[in-house]
From Swiss-Prot:
Belongs to the GMC oxidoreductase family. InterPro entries: FAD/NAD-bd_sf, GMC_OxRdtase, GMC_OxRdtase_N, GMC_OxRtase_C. Involved in the inactivation of ecdysteroid molting hormones by converting ecdysteroids into 3-dehydroecdysteroids. It is an enzyme of class 1 (oxidoreductase). PANTHER family: CHOLINE DEHYDROGENASE, MITOCHONDRIAL, GLUCOSE-METHANOL-CHOLINE GMC OXIDOREDUCTASE. The gene is EO. It catalyses: ecdysone + O2 = 3-dehydroecdysone + H2O2. One of its GO terms (molecular function) is oxidoreductase activity, acting on CH-OH group of donors. This is Ecdysone oxidase. Coiled coil: none annotated.
Length: 668
């Protein structure tokens, strides 16, 4: 009980009522949470059919799907632990970055870009907990565009063409955004029977409405569904939020996996893949300062992410021979592991405006907490994100190359901490913080969606606990930088629209020492080079076509696959979380088919939406298709489900290798 509260409430009926209310809200905070999967108690040297390294977005989905097969035994290892409560409440997403559940990766300083960032390096937040980055991202549901997957298919085969990947997006999706559900033309591209909820909001923030109006004035059409293929403009994203809480492959799939043949080890750091005679046979891992070995009878699968997957491959002898030999690592397979690193390049533009511009939905914090505890509504339950997609030219009006992401920041906001988390340097954050004491800030993230620049990931040393070296390579191709004068000027033009003009909005050009005394376009290029950072969507370091094949098998190594964002040969035009789930879903079916196991869950070949079946699904790469010709109603997906009996699987401890192993993993 709060000090002095008893005497304040009194002893009568009113006091009893208020006391009960206080106790109710104190108790309901305990209901904000999740019962996460428990650690297993395993014999050192235990054997499994499949060992999956990394319980992030991909690993959680893949482990859950493989565990649907009764005679598959699966071990899932995660370097982190359980997500904190902040990972569940949407509004607290930013507090997880630069925390103990973040790998806190950074790029290597190159003295060419990012001079306006702290230490001249780009921040690369990645989730180090169950759910991985799916437990700390912004929950934006984006898929990319059909042309992205036509590129993939040309490199890795027709498994990855748009028509096929769309079926897998729909398989996992449970769309509840009423703006989409009530529109048959939109719903033809969405699922209603999947595990992960994709929701909208009927209470769009005031500032978001004003941004949409501003973009409409600037010539953008308003798009009701930001995943709709071949249609670009400005609009609000749907989000993976269920009943006011973050949804993800962890919560929707792994948490609901009931198989006794799925074992999970948390706080377990995998240090090496064991490869013998060209075959991956297991992994080496450290838990509680002890080293353990586990063996895979069928496959080792890496789902450790764009930075840790190449690190593990290289530590295990799979990588560029010159780099491995320079560290004294025996080369098992000479592959361009770590190459092809690329990301959406992001530069911030700034406006200031009169107080009252944002009209924040953030009511007094305690009231928002009460609303959230009571019925999971209010500001804490939201993740309002919007964007405006821009084509490169009018000749390709349905394929975006750039995006603008605006945010309105009320006066006296705790902007400084977020600024530093983003990675801007102290001087710049202080300048913006001081402006926010007088004005409201508008930030517009200008993002290049299809960069040509490439970087790389290399080993720092042979110590597996050392972070990899991340050479971002941003603007290594000057052509990428050349786009930003146009893009930043488009962001600035928001100040000239009716509402923002009425609020005296004006452009702020932050002081960047290297960029003084330049013309406007030259200043923008200089500033962009100095301020550019990652949009936290890095991909490509174990790419299909060069490191893995179209079935995600590592070239030249038996029994080893990669299933995560690192396999993307080219980045998609949008946030990468939903595509990573899709990759895991496809991988699960590829593995089941390889071992002659029937697929489980939604029968994709019989998937029906309205009277549109998977076999008759239109080629969406043709923007002139008349969807009205193929849609007559908005029936829900008719899923053919295959029931699978889950049986206990005996975990066998090897005897021939037991001399190497003395301990048992004892987990509470």
């Amino acid at each position: 009980m709060v000090c002095g509260l008893t005497s304040c409430l009194g002893s009568g009926a009113a006091g009893g009522l208020f006391s009960s209310a206080v106790q109710f809200f104190a108790a309901t905070q305990c209901l904000v949470g999740e019962t996460w999967p428990k650690d297993s108690v395993l014999q050192n040297g235990s054997r499994y059919d499949f060992i999956i390294v990394g319980a992030g977005t991909a690993g959680s989905a893949l482990a859950a799907r493989l565990s649907e097969v009764a005679n598959f035994s699966v071990l899932l290892l995660e370097a982190g632990g359980d997500p904190p409560i902040e990972a569940i409440i949407p509004a607290f997403r930013e507090t997880l970055k630069a925390s103990s559940v973040d790998w806190n990766f950074t790029s290597v300083e190159n003295n060419i870009t990012s001079q306006a960032l702290k230490r001249g390096i780009e921040q690369q937040p990645r989730g180090k907990m169950l759910g991985g980055s799916g437990s700390l991202n912004h929950m934006v549901y984006a898929r990319g565009f059909p042309s992205d997957y036509h590129e993939w298919a040309s490199i890795a085969g027709e498994t990855w063409n748009w028509t096929n990947v769309l079926k897998y997006f729909m398989k996992t999706e449970h769309m509840t955004d009423t703006n989409i559900v009530n529109n048959p033309e939109l719903m033809v591209y969405h699922g209603r029977g999947g595990a992960i909820e994709v929701s909208g909001t009927n209470e769009v923030m005031f500032s978001i409405k004003k941004f949409l109006q501003a973009f409409e004035e600037l010539g953008f059409k308003t798009v009701p569904d930001m995943t709709y293929p071949n249609s670009i403009g400005a609009g609000c994203f749907s989000h993976t939020i269920r009943n006011g809480e973050r949804d993800s492959s962890l919560r929707a799939l792994l948490n609901n996996a009931n198989s006794t043949s799925l074992h999970i080890l948390k706080d377990t750091f995998v240090t090496k893949i064991i490869i013998e005679n060209g075959t991956a046979i297991g992994i080496e891992a450290v838990k509680d300062d002890k080293t353990f070995l586990f063996y895979a009878d069928r496959e080792v699968i890496l789902s450790a992410g764009t930075f840790n997957t190449p690190k593990l491959l290289m530590l295990s002898g799979v990588g560029r021979s010159e780099h491995l030999r320079s560290l004294g690592i025996d080369v098992v397979a000479d592959l361009p592991v770590g190459s092809n690193l690329h990301d959406h390049a992001m530069v911030l533009a700034f406006l200031v405006a009169d107080n009252g511009t944002c009209v924040s939905d953030e009511a007094e914090n305690s009231m928002e907490a009460i609303k959230y505890l009571y019925d999971r509504t209010g500001f804490l339950a939201k993740a309002d994100n919007m964007a405006a997609y821009l084509p490169l030219s009018s000749s390709e009006p349905t394929v975006p190359e750039f995006a603008l992401y605006p945010t309105c920041i009320p006066q006296f906001s705790p902007f400084r901490s977020g600024c530093l988390t983003l990675g801007l340097n102290e001087d710049l954050c202080t300048e913006l913080h001081n402006l926010n004491q007088e004005y409201e800030l508008v930030t517009i993230a200008a993002v290049l969606l299809k960069p040509k620049s490439r970087g790389k990931v290399e080993l720092n040393s042979i110590n597996p606990f050392d972070d990899p070296l991340i050479y971002a390579g941003t603007f290594s191709e000057e052509q990428d930088l050349d786009h930003f004068p146009r893009l930043i000027k488009m962001a600035w033009s928001i100040a000239d629209t009716n509402y923002f003009r009425s609020k005296n909005a004006r452009v702020i050009k932050p002081w960047v020492e290297a960029c003084s005394n330049l013309t406007e376009s030259a200043w923008i290029k200089c500033m962009s080079r100095a301020m550019v950072t990652s949009a936290w969507h890095s991909v490509g370091t174990a790419a299909m076509g060069t490191v893995v094949d179209g079935d995600l098998k590592v070239l030249g190594i038996n029994g080893l696959r990669v299933v995560d964002a690192s396999v993307m040969p080219k980045i998609i035009r949008g946030n990468t979380n939903a595509p990573v789930v899709m990759i895991a879903e496809i991988a699960a079916d590829l593995i089941k088919e390889h071992y002659s196991v029937s697929r489980t869950g939604t029968n994709l070949n019989n998937m029906t939406i309205g009277n549109l079946t998977a076999s008759s699904m239109p080629n969406i790469s043709q923007p002139n298709i008349n969807l009205a010709d193929v849609i007559e109603n908005n029936d829900m997906i008719n899923s053919s489900l295959i029931e699978v009996e889950i049986t206990n699987v005996e975990i066998i401890t090897t005897t021939d290798r037991q001399s190497d192993i003395d301990d048992t993993v004892n987990v509470a």
